[in-house]
Amino acid sequence: MKIADKTVTRAILERHGFTFKKLFGQNFLTDTNILQKIVDTAEIDKTVNVIEIGPGIGALTEFLAENAAEVMAFEIDDRLVPILADTLRDFDNIKVVNEDILKSDLQTRIKEFANPDLPIKVVANLPYYITTPILMHLIESKIPFAEFVVMMQKEVADRISAQPSTKAYGSLSIAVQYYMTAKIAFIVPRTVFVPAPNVDSAILKMTRREQPLVQVQDEDFFFCVGKAAFVHRRKTLWNNLTSHFGKSEEVKVKLEQALEAADIKPSIRGEELTITDFARLADALREVDLK
């Protein structure tokens, strides 16, 4: 029987006297069909290494290790390390790392794979409270992860994969889609977790683009403009930009010049702009010395 079988999960938790900590946003998946779908979605086979974040008691880790060349699982809760040593004892291709993924030296860690030259995929059931920081940390790192298949709160998955002129579209959509393609693979109901979270989850598949979606003069400034445009969603782009850059006559003249050069109407809302529009706008703002 698999670790994710509900009776097995309960027995493991009881045997080790484990209690859930809200601090770590722990929800363990107890549906083997969904775990298999995650592995299938990620297309895991012996030609790839996997980094897993938040293995819990090893339910997903077990499925990954059966299919991948090697799995490196990052677990922040040191109480789970001996449990993982127990539940995954039959595998010789799993390395459990008791570290916070945000603080880990990943460049050094990935050299510890038996074959570090294999493509690396990230597969994870991310804690809701820290999904975005972890994703952006990994995406912006210099490590060429081939793909991310990540379980997260459905609302966050909607925001990441959203298209312009939709309610969910915003600065997070821009930040991720600049580097990756993003598509929701399937929905995971809250009922298949122990304990059950308050919301449904989604599996989001993100594949790294060979080149960023658009070319910009300054990436940091491009992301900054994207954030500024959504500070007040219901306000116009002009209102958000003057709130960010200032309302002096000099600034307003420069903003008008930049918007005209980028062929963007001041009365438009941020959610109506494509990522290509934002790239033109950011470069035009730099040209008039608004940074």
Curated annotation (Swiss-Prot):
Pfam families: RrnaAD (PF00398). This is Ribosomal RNA small subunit methyltransferase A. Its EC number is 2.1.1.182. PANTHER family: DIMETHYLADENOSINE TRANSFERASE (PTHR11727), DIMETHYLADENOSINE TRANSFERASE-RELATED (PTHR11727:SF7). S-adenosyl-L-methionine binds at residues 27, 29, 54, 75, 100, 125. PROSITE patterns: RRNA_A_DIMETH, SAM_RNA_A_N6_MT. The gene is rsmA. CDD domains: AdoMet_MTases.
